[in-house]
C-alpha cells in the first residue's frame, strides 16, 4: 500500500462527513448517511444540522451502521457571545440524540479582549454534554482570529473549559483550516499535556487525499503515529471523501459538495 493510500484509509475512518447547507433536506441527509458507509470502511461520523438527527439515526440503523456517530452544530456559524442561547441550542441538540456537539466559540468577543465569556460558554455546554455522555468539540474560527496568539489563546481557553476536541473552522468564512493553524492548535494540546484527553479537528478546505496526508503528518510528528485515532482526530469535510476513495481505487474523485 502506498503512503497516500495508507493515509487516505486513515483519513476516511477519521472523517466527520458533513452537510451544513441552507438547502439541506431529509433526502440529502439520507444520501449522506449512505455515503458514510463506503467499500473500504465507514467514516467516524456524520455532521448535520440538529433537526436532521432523527432521520439520520433511523437511516444509519437501517443500513446496518449504527456505530457511525452523529455530530451536530450549535451557536453556529456566528459564534455569538450569548451563553444562554448557546446552552439552549446545545441542550436541544442533545435531546435530538446527538453523539457529539460542535459549538462555535465566541471568537469575536475574544478579539475584543473578553476571555471570560468564551470560557463560561464552553464550560456551560461541556456540563450539558458530559451529563449526557456527548463529546464536545469547540470551533475557534482560526481564519477570523488570524493572529497566532489569539488562535493559541482560544485553544487554551476551550481546553481549560472542558473541550473534548478543538476544531479550526465552521467552513462558513473566507479562510478555514490551514496547516499553519492546525500546527498551532496541536502544539497547544501538546504544550498543555492534554493529548490523552483532547483531540483536534481541521474543518473546511481539506479537500484532497494529499491535503489530508499533510494534516495527518503534523499530528504524527507531534504525537507519534498512534495518536490520530477517532477519539483524538477528525476531519470535517464532504468533498474530501470522493478524493480519498479515488486514491483508494474507488470512484472518480468527483463530489457534489464543497465543504
Swiss-Prot record:
The active site is at 102 (proton donor/acceptor), 167 (schiff-base intermediate with acetaldehyde), 201 (proton donor/acceptor). Pathway: Carbohydrate degradation; 2-deoxy-D-ribose 1-phosphate degradation; D-glyceraldehyde 3-phosphate and acetaldehyde from 2-deoxy-alpha-D-ribose 1-phosphate: step 2/2. Its EC number is 4.1.2.4. Its main location: cytoplasm. One of its GO terms (cellular component) is membrane. It comes from the Bacteria. Keywords: Acetylation, Cytoplasm, Lyase, Schiff base. GO terms for biological process: 2-deoxyribose 1-phosphate catabolic process; carbohydrate catabolic process; deoxyribonucleotide catabolic process; DNA damage response; nucleobase-containing small molecule interconversion. Catalyzes a reversible aldol reaction between acetaldehyde and D-glyceraldehyde 3-phosphate to generate 2-deoxy-D-ribose 5-phosphate. Can also catalyze the double aldol condensation of three acetaldehyde molecules, leading to the formation of 2,4,6-trideoxyhexose. Monomer and homodimer. This is Deoxyribose-phosphate aldolase. It comes from Escherichia coli (strain K12). The lineage of its organism: Bacteria, Pseudomonadati, Pseudomonadota, Gammaproteobacteria, Enterobacterales.
